Amino acid sequence: ILTGVYEMADMHDVDYVLLLTNNRDQEKKSLSQYCLENNISGLVLHGFSTADPYLLELATLKIPNLLIDIHPEAADSYGIAVNNEVAAYQATEFLISRGHRAIAMISGKSWAQVSKDRESGYQKCMADHHLPTFIYEGLFSEEYSEELVKDILSDHPEITALFCASDLMAIGAVKGIQAMNLNVPQDISVIGFDDIAIAKYVTPSLTTIKQDMHEIGRRSCEILLEILDKGQIDQKQFYVKHSLIERESVSSR
């Protein structure tokens, strides 16, 4: 994302400032203070929870801002992401098309908008096919998901496929499945989300939803510059294309 933002900012000869923040920093200084001290005219925000104090401050900030992976609510806020709900629906539909009927989802952190959107897509697809849902919180953690999947499959041996809301959780799940002396994909199929660089190199290589993070960063800066130039624009939510990358971690039943 950052390289995409920097690339577009450099192209338009725009100065940019990177702020890495946490709860302790936010207690010391408000977002409005930071923007005032650094003469900020526009913001691109990423990695915040939906209840983050900085996000809540946007309603009164009156500075154009673009939120990555969060739905815009404030008057001066705009949003950009892949359509996470549609992409999750597509991933689940892909597993169903391969004959799977008992499909569990390992979601991310409950406070993350992407987790909520991807859960919604999974739930809608399963409901459309009149299938039961199994949703577990994997915290976007490879290690946690590796242990979690053992509990999932022990409690629900009927499950034949997993949709994981990130590739890291999918890789952890594969390790956990293999530790149970089960085979991926012959026994359990796994599909991830992101298409991180390592996804094609793990064994088996990971079937996943690809989102172009560089393009999200580039478009974020491009849209923000357009907003700053025009004052405001009518469109509030923007989407970057995603695609399903089929590799070796899913098989037919």
Regions found by a protein language model. Give the residues of each.
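Bacterial carbohydrate/catabolite-sensing allosteric modules
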Residues: T3-V17, G42, A59-L67, H71-R253
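Short, well-ordered alpha-helical microsegments
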Residues: K28, A51-Y54, A170-A173
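Catalytic-core regions built around general acid/base machinery
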Residues: Q33-Y34, P53-K62
